[in-house]
Amino acid sequence: MYKSILSKTTSHQELSEQEVFDLIKAIKNDEISDAQIAGFQVALLMKGASLEEIAYIAKAMRENCVPLKPDVKEDLMDTCGTGGGLSTFNISTATAIVAAAAGIPVAKHGSRSISSLSGSADVLEALGVNINLTPAQAERLIEEIGIAFIYAPLFHPVMCKVLPAETDLGIKTIFYTIIGPLI
């Protein structure tokens, strides 16, 4: 399965939804090595992901995350940033706090800094916030105070497997800059 997906990607052919789902499932189940994950990331970066492939990857990643279902009447907001800002402060975290203070329920996704001065997890830890919440704790906080931090490594197990390869490569792929904020 992996070899056919890599072959298609390096030949600049589009992946089907099923191929993407199979790949994400294989990553989640540790059926693909870190080197193979990195190979796919580079091949996809070189080819350029189509809108359909981005949608398929985001959908597959969402179906493989830890679900949250807080009991709130309003739509739940997320202010996940894309990382690598212009050497400014962490805008996505500040936005989450302001939105929650205005009464909008927020599930603020984020992680540690990879390419910027401070990731959301770094900022919140510096403020004394517990970032290692269980799904039940996050749901309760959203219901009671209107905001919870959703630490990506705990809620997105597949992302935990693709980001180390991206970090080792020293390049940004769609997983960090596009897929992360979408899921």
Regions of interest found by a model, annotated:
Residues 137-183:
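Phosphate/diphosphate-binding glycine-rich loops and adjacent basic-rich segments that engage nucleotide
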Residues 41, 90-145:
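A glycine-rich phosphate/pyrophosphate-binding beta-strand-loop-alpha-helix module
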Residues 78-79, 106-110, 131-134, 149-151, ...:
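General beta-strand structural signal in soluble alpha/beta enzymes
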